[in-house]
């Protein structure tokens, strides 16, 4: 990996640029970010960080266990015109598979919190983080609250909370009680008379009515009052949401959590269109891994070996980060130049809504079709034209044939 490329500096510049190019989606003056994990399959035996990974959902095309890299990623919500909102990818890092020191006790939750706090410091803004139930932990909430940030997440159905303890009129010996009666959220979900009905605010749902209820109770993992929202959905069942921001309305909580799927849609585009996770860099001097192996412990390896692993890990991160930037720029073009993209698409789709921002695939195809205009006038960007002429593809990309089909 070239020492001239600092991935952290590149990421910080990209995060700041996102706020300039797009209009961020804000809630109570806070930027809304989405976090999730992705597993990139890798069969390389000499690729640092490759380990056996478990996938929750199984199927014929998605085995239960794979070998690959485990990454955690973050996106920021921005306004996307008639499409509502979009999730611009910010950062993606490998957070499993390598243990450089046996004194390192950081978990995936600790590493994600570090990403959130670092990005927030780049913006000098407060953040509302939206994540799934895996991140509903005190290890995430306490550091975020300490810096003035908030978390919106989903809870498991067996979650419990506590009422605030009643304070006696006269102070007695000992520490005053903090936690009162224990309350199971699934019991609150059975009290039908306490629920209100409203139209579903979730993106893409029309004609769907939901029943909801909000309560504020003590949650022991963080030792403070948080806001719980219980939602009865006619198709998705009962949903339990948690927000550390006590001012969020129940329907706003449901609406924001509904946007969480946009990062998963972004993962699909990153894998199948951008190729952000299609790297195959390997390390010649690395000890080969076997199928089923777990973390690679490097505290007994030589300094040169560990330096080689760090360089290779930096190469992975640089490749993925450039993929995030490329995908984000495609989304920017789709949002801000919708008509121009459709006009230069030059192909056909079964479902084409010219008033909606196109997908990354359509934008990439439009850029390819107009590449000759840039090359026809090299004086516009001589260095870029030289690079494009040297590395251009002579064969049509496979996704172009799929679109035409």
Predicted regions, residues:
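Single, function-defining residue in the core of a domain
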Residues: 14, 29, 46, 83-405
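Active-site-proximal, Lys/Arg-enriched surface segment
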Residues: 2-85, 93, 200
């Amino acid at each position: 990996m070239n020492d001239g490329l600092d991935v952290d500096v590149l990421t910080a510049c990209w995060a700041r640029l996102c706020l300039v190019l797009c209009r961020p989606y804000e809630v109570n003056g806070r930027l809304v970010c989405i976090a999730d994990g992705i597993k990139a399959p890798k069969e390389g035996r000499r690729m640092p960080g490759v380990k056996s990974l478990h996938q929750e959902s199984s199927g014929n095309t998605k085995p239960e266990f794979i070998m690959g890299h485990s990454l955690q990623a973050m996106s920021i919500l921005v306004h996307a015109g008639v499409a509502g909102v979009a999730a611009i990818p910010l950062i993606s890092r490998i957070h499993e598979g390598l243990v450089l020191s046996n004194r390192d006790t950081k978990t995936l939750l600790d590493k994600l919190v570090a990403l959130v706090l670092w990005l927030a410091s780049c913006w000098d803004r407060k953040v509302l983080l939206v994540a799934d139930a895996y991140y509903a932990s005190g290890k995430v909430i306490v550091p975020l609250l300490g810096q003035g940030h908030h978390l919106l997440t989903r809870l498991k159905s067996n979650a419990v909370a506590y009422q605030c303890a009643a304070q006696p009129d006269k102070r007695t010996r000992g520490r005053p009680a903090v936690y009162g009666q224990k309350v199971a959220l699934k019991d609150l979900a059975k009290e039908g008379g306490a629920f209100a009905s409203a139209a579903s605010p979730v993106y893409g749902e029309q004609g769907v009515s939901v029943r909801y209820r909000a309560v504020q109770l003590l949650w022991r993992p963080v030792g403070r009052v948080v806001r719980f929202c219980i939602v009865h959905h006619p198709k998705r069942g009962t949903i339990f949401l948690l927000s550390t921001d006590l001012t969020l309305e129940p329907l706003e909580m449901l609406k924001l959590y509904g946007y969480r799927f946009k990062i998963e849609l972004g993962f699909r585009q990153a894998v199948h269109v951008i190729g952000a996770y299609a790297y195959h860099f390997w390390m010649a001097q690395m000890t080969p891994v076997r199928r089923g192996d777990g973390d690679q412990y490097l505290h007994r390896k030589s300094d040169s070996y560990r330096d080689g692993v760090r360089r290779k890990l930096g190469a992975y991160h640089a490749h993925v980060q450039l993929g995030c930037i490329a995908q984000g720029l495609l989304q920017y073009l789709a949002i801000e130049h919708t008509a121009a993209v459709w006009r230069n698409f030059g192909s056909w789709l079964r479902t084409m809504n010219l008033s909606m921002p196109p997908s990354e695939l359509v934008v990439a195809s439009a850029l390819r079709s107009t590449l000759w205009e840039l090359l026809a006038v090299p004086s516009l960007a001589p260095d870029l034209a030289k690079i494009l002429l040297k590395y251009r593809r002579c064969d049509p990309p496979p996704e172009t044939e799929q679109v035409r089909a």
